Protein backbone atom coordinates (compact mmCIF):
# COMPACT_ATOMS: atom_id res chain seq x y z
CA UNK A 1 0.00 0.00 0.00
CA UNK A 2 2.85 2.43 0.83
CA UNK A 3 4.34 1.97 -2.63
CA UNK A 4 0.96 2.41 -4.34
CA UNK A 5 0.28 5.65 -2.46
CA UNK A 6 3.77 6.96 -3.25
CA UNK A 7 3.42 6.05 -6.93
CA UNK A 8 0.02 7.74 -7.19
CA UNK A 9 1.27 10.96 -5.57
CA UNK A 10 4.44 10.99 -7.68
CA UNK A 11 2.20 10.49 -10.73
CA UNK A 12 0.26 13.67 -9.88
CA UNK A 13 -2.60 12.53 -7.65
CA UNK A 14 -3.49 15.46 -5.35
CA UNK A 15 -2.57 14.95 -1.71
CA UNK A 16 -3.35 17.03 1.37
CA UNK A 17 -1.65 15.53 4.42
CA UNK A 18 -1.70 16.99 7.92
CA UNK A 19 0.24 15.76 10.95
CA UNK A 20 0.02 11.94 10.94
CA UNK A 21 -0.55 11.89 7.18
CA UNK A 22 2.55 14.05 6.76
CA UNK A 23 4.50 11.60 8.93
CA UNK A 24 3.28 8.68 6.81
CA UNK A 25 4.61 10.33 3.63
CA UNK A 26 8.22 10.37 4.93
CA UNK A 27 10.84 7.79 3.95
CA UNK A 28 11.30 6.53 7.51
CA UNK A 29 9.78 6.76 10.97
CA UNK A 30 11.68 5.97 14.13
CA UNK A 31 9.32 4.10 16.43
CA UNK A 32 9.04 4.24 20.21
CA UNK A 33 11.29 1.16 20.24
CA UNK A 34 14.10 3.12 18.55
CA UNK A 35 13.87 1.10 15.33
CA UNK A 36 13.39 2.77 11.94
CA UNK A 37 10.44 1.71 9.84
CA UNK A 38 9.88 2.23 6.11
CA UNK A 39 7.10 4.68 5.26
CA UNK A 40 5.66 5.87 1.92
CA UNK A 41 8.83 7.67 0.78
CA UNK A 42 7.14 10.67 -0.84
CA UNK A 43 8.96 13.15 1.43
CA UNK A 44 12.69 12.61 1.91
CA UNK A 45 13.72 12.25 5.53
CA UNK A 46 12.75 10.77 8.85
CA UNK A 47 10.32 11.48 11.68
CA UNK A 48 10.96 10.55 15.31
CA UNK A 49 9.34 10.89 18.73
CA UNK A 50 10.54 13.70 20.98
CA UNK A 51 10.28 13.69 24.79
CA UNK A 52 7.78 16.58 24.86
CA UNK A 53 5.34 18.51 22.69
CA UNK A 54 7.02 20.16 19.73
CA UNK A 55 5.86 23.51 18.29
CA UNK A 56 2.64 23.35 20.31
CA UNK A 57 -0.23 25.82 19.91
CA UNK A 58 -1.92 28.28 17.59
CA UNK A 59 -0.06 29.61 14.56
CA UNK A 60 -0.69 31.72 11.48
CA UNK A 61 0.55 30.33 8.17
CA UNK A 62 1.61 32.49 5.24
CA UNK A 63 2.78 31.03 1.96
CA UNK A 64 6.47 31.74 1.37
CA UNK A 65 7.13 33.66 -1.83
CA UNK A 66 10.34 33.92 -3.80
CA UNK A 67 11.27 30.25 -3.64
CA UNK A 68 11.86 30.58 -7.37
CA UNK A 69 11.64 33.35 -9.92
CA UNK A 70 9.22 31.25 -11.99
CA UNK A 71 5.63 31.53 -10.76
CA UNK A 72 4.62 27.96 -11.57
CA UNK A 73 7.37 26.66 -9.29
CA UNK A 74 6.01 28.62 -6.31
CA UNK A 75 2.40 27.59 -6.96
CA UNK A 76 0.92 25.26 -4.37
CA UNK A 77 -2.14 23.31 -5.48
CA UNK A 78 -2.14 25.54 -8.56
CA UNK A 79 -2.26 28.80 -6.54
CA UNK A 80 0.55 31.34 -6.19
CA UNK A 81 -1.10 32.89 -3.11
CA UNK A 82 -3.22 30.77 -0.80
CA UNK A 83 -3.52 33.65 1.65
CA UNK A 84 -3.07 33.59 5.41
CA UNK A 85 -4.34 30.57 7.31
CA UNK A 86 -4.84 30.06 11.01
CA UNK A 87 -3.75 26.62 12.18
CA UNK A 88 -2.36 24.77 15.16
CA UNK A 89 0.32 22.20 15.87
CA UNK A 90 0.10 19.56 18.58
CA UNK A 91 2.57 16.69 18.24
CA UNK A 92 5.32 14.81 19.99
CA UNK A 93 7.07 13.90 16.74
CA UNK A 94 9.51 15.96 14.70
CA UNK A 95 10.95 15.73 11.20
CA UNK A 96 14.33 16.44 9.67
CA UNK A 97 12.42 17.81 6.65
CA UNK A 98 9.46 19.95 7.78
CA UNK A 99 9.31 21.85 4.47
CA UNK A 100 9.56 25.51 3.47
CA UNK A 101 6.35 26.25 1.55
CA UNK A 102 4.82 28.26 4.43
CA UNK A 103 6.04 30.35 7.33
CA UNK A 104 4.37 29.74 10.68
CA UNK A 105 4.16 32.59 13.20
CA UNK A 106 3.05 32.38 16.82
CA UNK A 107 0.44 35.01 17.77
CA UNK A 108 1.76 37.88 19.89
CA UNK A 109 5.30 36.57 19.55
CA UNK A 110 8.29 36.92 17.28
CA UNK A 111 8.68 33.15 17.16
CA UNK A 112 8.27 31.56 13.73
CA UNK A 113 9.53 28.79 11.48
CA UNK A 114 9.19 27.46 7.96
CA UNK A 115 7.00 24.42 7.49
CA UNK A 116 4.97 22.34 5.05
CA UNK A 117 5.82 20.87 1.68
CA UNK A 118 3.98 22.28 -1.30
CA UNK A 119 3.85 21.56 -4.99
CA UNK A 120 1.30 21.75 -7.78
CA UNK A 121 -0.51 18.72 -6.34
CA UNK A 122 0.80 18.31 -2.76
CA UNK A 123 0.39 20.14 0.54
CA UNK A 124 1.79 18.29 3.54
CA UNK A 125 3.01 19.28 6.99
CA UNK A 126 2.47 19.06 10.73
CA UNK A 127 0.00 22.00 10.98
CA UNK A 128 -3.72 21.32 11.31
CA UNK A 129 -5.40 23.89 9.04
CA UNK A 130 -8.65 25.73 9.82
CA UNK A 131 -10.49 25.43 6.52
CA UNK A 132 -13.43 27.66 7.46
CA UNK A 133 -11.03 30.53 8.16
CA UNK A 134 -9.38 30.20 4.73
CA UNK A 135 -11.48 28.26 2.22
CA UNK A 136 -8.92 28.92 -0.56
CA UNK A 137 -6.88 25.89 0.50
CA UNK A 138 -9.63 23.24 0.41
CA UNK A 139 -11.08 24.84 -2.74
CA UNK A 140 -7.68 24.65 -4.48
CA UNK A 141 -7.29 21.04 -3.36
CA UNK A 142 -10.75 20.06 -4.62
CA UNK A 143 -10.08 21.81 -7.94
CA UNK A 144 -6.89 19.75 -8.31
CA UNK A 145 -8.85 16.57 -7.48
CA UNK A 146 -11.38 17.34 -10.22
CA UNK A 147 -8.60 18.07 -12.72
CA UNK A 148 -6.90 14.79 -11.81
CA UNK A 149 -10.19 12.91 -12.20
CA UNK A 150 -10.62 14.33 -15.71
CA UNK A 151 -7.08 13.28 -16.66
CA UNK A 152 -7.80 9.71 -15.55
CA UNK A 153 -10.71 9.30 -18.00
Regions found by a protein language model. Give the residues of each.
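Cysteine-nucleophile active-site neighborhood
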Residues: 1-69
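Amide-donor transfer/coupling interface in amidating biosynthetic enzymes
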Residues: 48-153
Amino acid sequence: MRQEIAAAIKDGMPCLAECGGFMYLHEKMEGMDGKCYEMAGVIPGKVWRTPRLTRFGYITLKQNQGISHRKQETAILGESDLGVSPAHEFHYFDSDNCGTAFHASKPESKRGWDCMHGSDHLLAGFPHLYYYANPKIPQAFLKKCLEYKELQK
